[in-house]
């Protein structure tokens, strides 16, 4: 049941990742035309990392086992979100929880916890880098560590609330899926037994 769902979700995510190529190229074009002030070096990082993350799942789906492909896609997505979060010109807030949300599609509560922990660590690292270039640090004289702690506390409260909701949702969804699967299996067994009793081939 979960294996079949994993394969289907992997296929869905590879299509989503391919569509993300458009968003990545749009960011790069906006940077090169001066709409966004990313800087040339950061723009190249977005371009290279973004295209690798967006394109490789469509290739690896032919070779990697479903579970390994799933972990690869979730890991790389969070890394890219972390890269975006380090820049002061990109507002990354609730997006840090995007990977745990994607993990919910697999109906595995343990996966939601694992992706949640990893995503939180990426968020903390990105906030540390990002907070060094905030207005308060550069112009108001507040210390980097002071701003880092303030931002991290705010993000953490928001993050914990969202993760608690996600975990409860995926637990309920998995239970419903298992109950439906059990009912379908029971009906199938009853049908097979009836065919054996009646000798019907229908």
Label every model-predicted segment.
Residues 1-66:
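N-terminal juxtamembrane segment and adjoining first transmembrane helix
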Residues 17-34, 72-94, 109-154, 164-167:
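Hydrophobic transmembrane alpha-helices
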Residues 34-39, 64, 133-138, 169-181:
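Membrane-interfacial segments
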Residues 47-49, 91-99, 153-157:
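Membrane-embedded alpha-helical segments of multi-pass membrane proteins
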Residues 67-71:
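Membrane-interfacial loop-to-transmembrane alpha-helix junctions, especially the N-terminal start
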Residues 154-185:
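Juxtamembrane or sensor-core-proximal signal-transducing alpha helices
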Residues 183-202:
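Primarily the dimerization/phosphotransfer
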